[in-house]
Regions:
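Short, charged recognition helix plus adjacent turn
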Residues: 2, 62, 70-98
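DNA major-groove recognition helix of helix-turn-helix
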Residues: 46, 56, 75
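A short, Lys/Arg-rich alpha-helix, primarily the initiator
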Residues: 1-23
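Recognition helix of helix-turn-helix/homeodomain-like DNA-binding domains
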Residues: 35-52
Length: 98
């Protein structure tokens, strides 16, 4: 088993990869086929055993039905949320709740 990546950036990226795939209604196997990769490739990315290279990100975004710019903005938003103090995150969540 490889090293599990746990930096804030890694956590945000893994969350984005998983959430975007699930939002598209894709299984890991279906996404892997779109990428012309084995299912283990997607699993390793989502579980932190592999890092998504910057050069691979545009193709990954396209396979998820996203423009690379949207993919990048979602990542930046998740990264900001991860680094935001918990008190501020709670306030934002309360403001969003009806």
């Amino acid at each position: 088993m490889g090293k599990i990546l746990r930096s804030i950036g890694d956590i945000a990226l893994r969350a984005l990869l998983t959430e975007a795939r699930e939002a598209e209604g894709l299984t890991q196997e279906q996404l892997a086929r779109k990428l012309n990769k084995p299912q283990s490739y997607v699993w390793k990315l989502e579980n932190g055993e592999r890092v998504l290279a910057y050069a691979e990100a545009p193709a990954y975004a396209r396979a998820l039905g996203l423009k690379f710019s949207e993919f990048s903005m979602r990542y930046a938003t998740l990264l900001r949320m991860q680094t935001m103090p918990m008190r501020k995150r709670r306030k934002l969540k309360q403001d969003d709740d009806p």
